[in-house]
C-alpha cells in the first residue's frame, strides 16, 4: 500500500487515482494526523509526503518516520512545488529516498 500525504485535494485525488489505476494500491490523506492513525493500524510499502502541510510539515514527518523503529525502513518520497537544489539536498539528507 502506498500512503500519500497531500493537503491539496485535487493533487491528492489525481495521484491516488493514477496509482490505483496502475495497479498500485494507494490511500491519500489530507492531514498528518489522519496518516499517522492509519499507519499505526497498517504498514505502508511506500510513503509520499508533501512538504507544506497543515499541522506538521513533511520534513518533520520524515524525521519522525526515520527515528521510529517501526517505520524507518519504509521508503519515503518527497512531493512538493519547492524544487530548489537546496530543498532537495535537505530532504535527501534527512532520509528521503527520492525527491
Q: Which role fits each region the language model picked out?
A:
Residues 1-99:
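N-terminal/domain-start alpha-helical segments
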